């Protein structure tokens, strides 16, 4: 332990840290050079004042540099949310990932266990028979053979072991709730990323731009979820060509009906997995339409679809042809053989 972080704790409470100062601070955290009290002090100073784009970008760049990296195919996309919306929905981003992969777009999905629902991405995948506790080489093999791979955050970010206990003791949101979607170990350049607050979508888009993303949609559902909503309009900050455009998106713009929010509320991992299987078998309803909407957006971000309506058509074919379901079966086989 050292006192190198100490001066920056007081600074962080009174003014934004520069990119260089923030990088130094997070180097101290990730190298285990700070005491738990110092870590907590820095995290709460940032949270109380409000983190800046430079601070997000600095923390994300240090975290990316220290992760166990994965080589992904060209054009790979991540489909992920911050979690923390407290809405307990069915596993929409997870199902979306398989639908998009079934449409021929490589998906390098970064995720963890439950945060905002009773069943996070890793919980749902485990319930469906996939082994999520695999390392970078196995994930790369999955991406090459199946066109989809799941990167369990703790398996790829060993430096987080230093801050994990502090986060648990604080018991409140910190900058790390935002960093997950910004620190994909495969370094993908395209993202469909949901945020638990509409106030985060533009800053997160600015961070992804600073970190080299080519095209990304940062979204917040009008129903309060960290994905495009099927029950209301959603806010979007779209990054493309270094420019950010903000707009609202309604399900009907994609040719989809509006459904009551209650129809996408999830349950236990087993119940969510059952709904997931039914969706892959073609069951209609709010869950499928929510997945189609998010898949359509991902296909636009991946340049696989020209617009949302075409994206819905492609995503529908991925489900009804059995392509999305086949991806689940293949990934289950590959991860359990690892």
UniProtKB/Swiss-Prot annotation:
Gene Ontology annotations of biological process type: L-tryptophan biosynthetic process
Binding site for Mg(2+) 1: 93, 227
Enzyme type, top EC level: transferase
Any one Gene Ontology cellular component term annotated for this protein: cytosol
Pathway: Amino-acid biosynthesis; L-tryptophan biosynthesis; L-tryptophan from chorismate: step 2/5
Gene Ontology MF, one: magnesium ion binding
Chain positions recorded as 5-phospho-alpha-D-ribose 1-diphosphate binding sites: 81, 84-85, 89, 91-94, 109-117, 121
Gene3D superfamilies on file: Nucleoside phosphorylase/phosphoribosyltransferase catalytic domain, Transferase, Pyrimidine Nucleoside Phosphorylase, Chain C
Residues holding anthranilate 2: 167
Keyword Metal-binding: yes
Co-factor(s): Mg(2+)
Binding site for Mg(2+) 2: 226-227
Swiss-Prot/TrEMBL keywords: Amino-acid biosynthesis, Aromatic amino acid biosynthesis, Glycosyltransferase, Magnesium, Metal-binding, Transferase, Tryptophan biosynthesis
One Pfam family cited in the UniProt record for this chain: Glycos_transf_3
Known catalytic reactions: N-(5-phospho-beta-D-ribosyl)anthranilate + diphosphate = 5-phospho-alpha-D-ribose 1-diphosphate + anthranilate
InterPro entries from the UniProt entry: Anthranilate_Pribosyl_Tfrase (IPR005940), Glycosyl_Trfase_fam3 (IPR000312), Glycosyl_Trfase_fam3_N_dom (IPR017459), Glycosyl_Trfase_fam3_N_dom_sf (IPR036320), Nuc_phospho_transferase (IPR035902)
Binding site for anthranilate 1: 81, 112
Cofactor remark: Binds 2 magnesium ions per monomer.
EC number: 2.4.2.18
NCBIfam families registered for this protein in UniProt: trpD
Subunit composition and interactions: Homodimer.
Protein task: Catalyzes the transfer of the phosphoribosyl group of 5-phosphorylribose-1-pyrophosphate (PRPP) to anthranilate to yield N-(5'-phosphoribosyl)-anthranilate (PRA).
Similarity comment text for this entry: Belongs to the anthranilate phosphoribosyltransferase family.
Protein's UniProt name: Anthranilate phosphoribosyltransferase
Organism, as annotated: Cereibacter sphaeroides (strain KD131 / KCTC 12085) (Rhodobacter sphaeroides)
Taxonomic lineage: Bacteria, Pseudomonadati, Pseudomonadota, Alphaproteobacteria, Rhodobacterales
């Amino acid at each position: 332990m050292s006192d190198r972080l100490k001066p920056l704790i007081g600074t962080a409470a009174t003014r934004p840290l520069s990119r260089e100062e923030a990088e130094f601070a997070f180097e101290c955290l990730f190298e285990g050079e700070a005491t738990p009290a110092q870590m907590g002090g820095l995290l709460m100073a940032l949270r109380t004042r409000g983190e800046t784009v430079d601070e997000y970008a600095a923390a994300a760049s240090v975290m990316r540099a220290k992760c166990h990296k994965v080589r992904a195919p060209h054009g790979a996309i991540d489909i992920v949310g911050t979690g923390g919306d407290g809405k307990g929905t069915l596993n929409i981003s997870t199902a979306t990932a398989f639908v998009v992969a079934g449409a021929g777009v490589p998906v390098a999905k970064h995720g963890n266990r439950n945060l905002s629902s009773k069943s996070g991405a890793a919980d749902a995948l485990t319930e469906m028979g996939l082994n999520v506790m695999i390392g970078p080489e196995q994930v790369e093999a999955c991406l090459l053979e199946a066109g989809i791979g799941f990167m369990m955050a703790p398996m790829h970010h060993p430096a987080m072991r230093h801050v994990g206990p502090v986060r648990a003791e604080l018991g409140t949101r910190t900058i790390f709730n935002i960093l997950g979607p910004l620190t994909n170990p495969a370094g993908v350049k395209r993202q469909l990323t949901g945020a638990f607050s509409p106030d985060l979508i533009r800053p997160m888009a600015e961070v992804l731009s600073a970190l080299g993303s080519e095209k990304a949609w940062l979204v917040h559902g009008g129903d309060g979820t960290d994905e495009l909503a099927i029950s209301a309009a959603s806010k979007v900050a779209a990054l493309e060509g270094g420019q950010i455009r903000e707009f609202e998106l309604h399900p009907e713009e994609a040719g989809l009906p509006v459904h009551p929010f209650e129809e996408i509320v999830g349950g236990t991992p087993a119940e969510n997995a059952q709904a997931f299987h039914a969706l892959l078998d073609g069951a209609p309803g709010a869950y499928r339409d929510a997945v189609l909407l998010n898949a359509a957006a991902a296909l636009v971000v991946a340049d696989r679809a020209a617009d949302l309506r075409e994206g819905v058509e492609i995503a529908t074919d991925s489900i009804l042809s059995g392509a999305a379901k086949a991806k689940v079966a293949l990934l289950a086989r590959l991860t359990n053989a690892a």
